Amino acid sequence: MPSISTNIILAFTTALLGVLIYRSHLMSSLLCLEGMMLSMFILVSLTTLNLHFSLATVTPIILLVFAACEAAVGLALLVMVSNTYGMDYIQNLNLLQC
């Protein structure tokens, strides 16, 4: 495995560990999720370029669309939670309440 792919997989693993370790704040979780999506985008782009598979060139763009949607929903949720509760602690949220 080339060193570039190893570094990208290491970045993905670091972001995944960040989600698992810093899960008390919503903002930290969102930043780690964005890091995971960025490393996945780079890995998919490099894999598509290395394979010379022309039909898969749209895959990184679709991944970016999903990342943008995830970021928009995450920021909307962060704004709603911080306006309602005044903090972004995930532990204090109960999503089962109406």
UniProtKB/Swiss-Prot annotation:
GO biological process: ATP synthesis coupled electron transport
Keyword Translocase belongs to the record: yes
GO cellular component: mitochondrial inner membrane; respiratory chain complex I
Chain segments annotated as transmembrane: 1-21, 26-46, 61-81
Catalytic activity: a ubiquinone + NADH + 5 H(+)(in) = a ubiquinol + NAD(+) + 4 H(+)(out)
EC nos: 7.1.1.2
Membrane topology: Multi-pass membrane protein
Signal peptide start and end residues: none
Role noted for this protein: Core subunit of the mitochondrial membrane respiratory chain NADH dehydrogenase (Complex I) which catalyzes electron transfer from NADH through the respiratory chain, using ubiquinone as an electron acceptor. Part of the enzyme membrane arm which is embedded in the lipid bilayer and involved in proton translocation.
Name of the protein this chain belongs to: NADH-ubiquinone oxidoreductase chain 4L
Source organism of the structure: Galago senegalensis
